[in-house]
C-alpha cells in the first residue's frame, strides 16, 4: 500500500512492548522457548471502524478538488512579484460560468477541444468495480463512460471527457453509503488525456523532432529554445503534434537531450501549457549541468510543482506568466519560496536577486567509518549471537515453521520499505511492497492496523510468505539498544539475497529491530519484530557474500575420515572458530591445512569473518 518515493521508515506507533501478551505459557520446545521471567497485562485496543474517519474524508475531498466552471480564479488583488515582460499579453478576467481552458493538449490545432477530468474515489480499492460504478451511475444525472478505470494504491480512479459529466459526478459525492456506513467521496480534477489516448510519436516523427531541436540549439551558449514547440513551423508543416504537457512527448524530448546534448546549460520551455512538472523530474539526471530554466507563460498553479525539479542546481529561473505568481503577498515571500527550492539562484524572472544569507561552515570532513557491533557485555554477546545463529538458520531454511518457538504468543511484527529518490523502481521489491507499513506514506488507519501482524501464529505465517533467502551472516552488525532484567532490545543490520522466484539472486539490505524477553534459562523470546528491507547499495553489493555462511544442516559436523577429524580439531583449536566454521574453511580449501590457514588469517585481518564463527 505504500508509494515510491524518499525514504521514510515505518514505526510501530500504535503499540507497546507488552500489548496483547497471553497469560498462557508453553513449555520449552527447543532453544527459543521457555518460561517467561515476567508477566505483562493484555491491553485493550479500540479497533474502530473499517473505513476512514470523517475528518480524513473531508481532508481528501478538499485536497485537489477543483471547480467545474473554470481553471482560473478572478483577480484577487494579490501581489504580482514582478511586472510583465514587454510582450506579455494583458490580463483577462475569466467568467466562472465558462468551461475550463484546454491545457491538456488533447484538442486539435484547428480549434477542436476535449476537456478531460480525473475522477478519484479515496479508499476506493475496498470496493468492487461493478458495484462502485453502478452505484455512481444510478445517482448521476447524466450517463457517463468511465475511461481507464484502475486502482492506484488505496484509491479508485477513472477519466471522463467533458465538464458536464464531471459536474454531474461531483454532485454524487457523499450520496452513496457503503456497507460500513461510510459516505463514498468523489473528487474531481482537471487532467491531461488518459495515457492510452495520448499519441505516441512514431520513429520518423522523432527523427524530425531531432532535426527541429538541433535548429533550436545554440552550441556556443549550450542553450536549447523549446518555446511554443507545438506551433513550430517545421513540425506543423509535417503534421507532427508535439505536446510537451503530455508525458509521452516530454519523455522523448528528455531522451533526445540525454543522448545528444547532456552538457545542456540553458533550457527554455515557456509557452507550452505546462500545468505540472512531474515529467521533468528526471531533468536533473539527464542534464545535470543545467543552470538556466525558463518556465514562463505556462499554467503552473502552485509553487509546490517546483519541488519536483528542485534537484536542479539553477542559477536563473523564469516563472512569470504562471498562475502561481498571483499567490504571493509580496516580492520577498515570492523570492523566499523559490529560493527555498533553489538556494543557489541568482536571477528570478530576469531580476538580480539579493545575495542569499549564508553562514560560515567548516571545511568538509570525512565521516569516520561505522563501528562494528555493540553488545555491552560478553554475556549479552554470547546470548544474542547464539540467538541470531539459531534464528537465521531456520529463517533461511525451506520451512520457517520452526520460528514458532522464537515468538511470544502475543508477538507483533511489521515490514516497511523506505522511500526516496535514490531508491530503485518499486517493481524490484514487489514481493515486499504489498505488506509495507510505511506510516509516512500509509495514512489509512485501517490499513495500518491490518498490516500489523499480531500473535505468533500470524507472525510466522506472514514470514513464511516472504521470499526464500540466504543471509550473509558475515555482514551482520548488531547493536544492543536497551537491557533490563526482563527485556532486551537489539537491532541487526546486514545483507541477504533471494534464492528463488523472479528476483532470484537479488541482493537486499535489511535492518531488523527485535524486542525480546527471557525464555528458559538461556534463551530469548521475541515480543516485537520490525523488519526494514531495501535494495543493497553498490558498496554493499561489493562486500556481500565474500565468505558465504555454512548451509544450514541438521547435522553440523557430518561423518569425516579419522584424518579429517584430527585436522578439523587442530584447525578449530588454532583458529578459535567453532567446528562448523572450521570445517567450512577446510572444505573450501580442499582440506589443504596450510592454504586454509592463510585464507583464515587474511579474512580475519580484513574483518570479514563473522563473530558467530567464534561462538561455541
From Swiss-Prot:
- Give any Gene Ontology cellular component: cytoplasm
Q: What is its main location?
A: nucleus
Biased region (Low complexity) positions are: 77-86
**SMART domains in the cross-refs:** TAP_C
Q: Which GO terms describe its biological process?
A: poly(A)+ mRNA export from nucleus
**Keyword annotations:** Cytoplasm, Leucine-rich repeat, mRNA transport, Nucleus, Repeat, Transport
Query: Which InterPro entries does its entry note?
Result: Leu-rich_rpt, LRR_dom_sf, NTF2-like_dom_sf, NTF2_dom, Nuclear_transport_factor_2_euk, Nucleotide-bd_a/b_plait_sf, NXF_fam, RBD_domain_sf
- Composition-biased stretches (Basic residues): 22-32
Molecular function GO terms recorded: RNA binding
* Repeat recorded as keyword: yes
Task: Please list the residue ranges that the record marks as compositionally biased, kind Basic and acidic residues.
Answer: 1-17
Q: NTF2 domain: which residues?
A: 383-533
Q: Could you tell me where this protein is found in the cell?
A: Nucleus, Nucleoplasm; Nucleus speckle; Cytoplasm; Nucleus
Q: Where is this region: Disordered?
A: 1-115
The job of this chain, per UniProt, is described as: Involved in the nuclear export of mRNA from the nucleus to the cytoplasm.
* Free-text note on domains in this protein's UniProt record: The leucine-rich repeats and the NTF2-domain are essential for the export of mRNA from the nucleus.
What is the name listed in the Swiss-Prot or TrEMBL entry for this protein? Nuclear RNA export factor 1
Source organism per UniProt: Coturnix japonica
Amino acid at each position: 500500500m505504500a508509494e515510491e518515493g524518499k525514504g521514510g521508515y515505518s514505526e510501530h506507533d500504535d503499540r507497546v512492548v507488552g500489548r496483547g501478551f497471553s497469560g498462557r505459557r508453553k513449555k520449552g520446545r527447543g532453544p527459543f522457548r521457555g518460561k517467561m521471567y515476567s508477566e505483562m497485562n493484555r491491553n485493550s485496543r479500540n479497533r474502530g471502524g473499517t473505513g476512514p474517519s470523517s475528518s480524513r474524508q473531508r481532508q481528501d475531498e478538499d485536497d485537489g478538488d477543483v471547480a467545474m466552471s473554470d481553471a482560473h480564479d478572478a483577480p484577487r488583488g494579490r501581489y504580482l512579484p514582478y511586472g510583465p515582460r514587454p510582450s506579455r499579453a494583458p490580463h483577462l478576467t475569466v467568467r466562472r460560468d465558462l468551461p475550463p481552458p484546454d491545457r491538456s493538449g488533447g484538442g486539435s490545432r484547428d480549434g477542436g477541444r476535449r476537456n478531460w477530468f480525473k475522477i478519484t474515489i479515496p479508499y476506493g480499492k475496498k470496493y468492487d468495480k461493478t458495484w462502485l460504478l453502478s452505484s455512481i451511475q444510478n445517482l448521476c444525472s447524466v450517463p457517463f463512460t468511465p475511461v481507464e478505470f484502475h486502482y492506484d494504491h488505496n484509491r479508485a480512479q477513472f477519466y471522463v471527457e467533458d465538464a458536464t459529466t464531471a459536474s454531474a459526478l461531483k454532485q454524487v459525492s457523499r450520496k452513496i453509503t457503503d456497507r460500513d456506513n461510510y459516505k463514498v467521496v468523489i473528487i474531481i480534477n482537471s487532467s491531461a488525456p488518459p495515457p492510452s489516448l495520448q499519441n505516441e510519436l512514431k520513429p520518423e516523427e522523432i527523427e524530425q523532432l531531432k532535426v527541429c531541436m538541433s535548429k533550436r540549439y545554440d552550441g556556443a551558449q549550450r542553450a536549447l529554445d523549446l518555446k511554443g514547440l507545438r506551433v513550430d513551423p517545421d513540425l506543423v508543416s509535417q503534421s507532427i503534434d508535439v505536446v510537451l504537457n503530455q508525458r509521452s512527448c516530454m519523455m522523448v524530448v528528455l531522451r533526445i537531450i540525454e543522448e545528444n546534448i547532456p552538457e545542456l546549460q540553458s533550457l527554455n520551455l515557456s509557452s507550452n501549457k505546462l500545468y505540472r512538472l512531474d515529467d521533468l523530474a528526471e531533468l536533473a539526471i539527464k542534464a545535470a549541468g543545467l543552470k538556466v530554466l525558463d518556465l514562463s507563460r505556462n499554467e503552473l498553479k502552485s509553487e509546490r510543482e517546483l519541488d519536483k525539479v528542485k534537484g536542479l542546481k539553477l542559477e536563473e529561473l523564469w516563472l512569470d506568466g504562471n498562475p502561481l505568481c498571483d499567490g504571493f503577498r509580496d516580492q520577498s515571500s515570492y523570492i523566499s519560496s523559490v529560493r527555498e527550492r533553489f538556494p543557489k539562484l541568482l536571477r528570478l524572472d530576469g531580476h538580480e536577486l539579493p545575495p542569499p544569507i549564508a553562514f560560515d561552515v567548516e571545511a568538509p570532513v570525512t565521516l569516520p567509518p561505522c563501528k562494528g557491533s555493540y553488545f555491552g557485555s560478553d554475556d549479552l554477546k554470547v546470548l544474542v549471537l547464539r540467538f541470531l545463529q539459531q534464528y537465521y538458520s531456520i529463517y533461511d531454511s525451506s520451512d520457517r515453521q520452526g520460528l514458532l518457538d522464537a515468538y511470544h504468543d502475543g508477538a507483533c511484527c511489521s515490514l516497511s520499505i523506505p522511500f526516496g529518490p535514490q531508491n530503485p523502481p518499486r517493481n524490484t521489491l514487489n514481493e515486499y511492497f504489498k505488506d509495507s507499513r510505511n506510516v509516512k506514506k500509509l495514512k489509512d488507519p485501517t490499513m495500518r492496523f491490518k498490516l500489523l501482524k499480531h500473535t505468533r501464529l500470524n507472525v510466522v505465517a506472514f514470514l513464511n510468505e516472504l521470499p526464500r533467502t540466504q543471509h550473509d551472516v558475515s555482514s551482520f552488525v548488531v547493536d544492543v539498544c536497551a537491557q533490563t532484567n526482563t527485556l532486551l532490545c537489539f537491532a541487526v543490520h546486514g545483507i541477504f539475497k533471494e534464492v528463488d522466484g523472479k528476483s532470484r539472486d537479488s541482493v537486499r539490505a535489511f535492518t531488523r529491530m527485535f524486542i525480546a524477553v527471557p525464555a528458559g534459562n538461556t534463551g530469548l523470546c521475541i515480543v516485537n519484530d520490525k523488519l526494514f528491507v531495501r535494495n543493497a547499495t553498490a558498496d554493499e553489493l561489493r562486500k556481500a557474500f565474500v565468505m558465504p555462511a555454512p548451509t544450514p544442516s541438521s547435522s553440523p559436523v557430518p561423518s569425516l575420515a579419522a584424518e579429517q577429524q584430527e585436522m578439523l580439531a587442530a584447525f578449530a583449536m588454532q583458529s578459535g572458530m567453532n567446528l562448523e566454521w572450521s570445517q567450512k574453511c577446510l572444505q573450501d580449501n580442499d582440506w589443504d591445512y596450510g592454504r586454509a590457514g592463510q585464507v583464515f588469517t587474511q579474512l580475519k585481518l580484513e574483518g570479514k569473518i563473522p563473530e558467530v564463527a567464534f561462538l561455541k
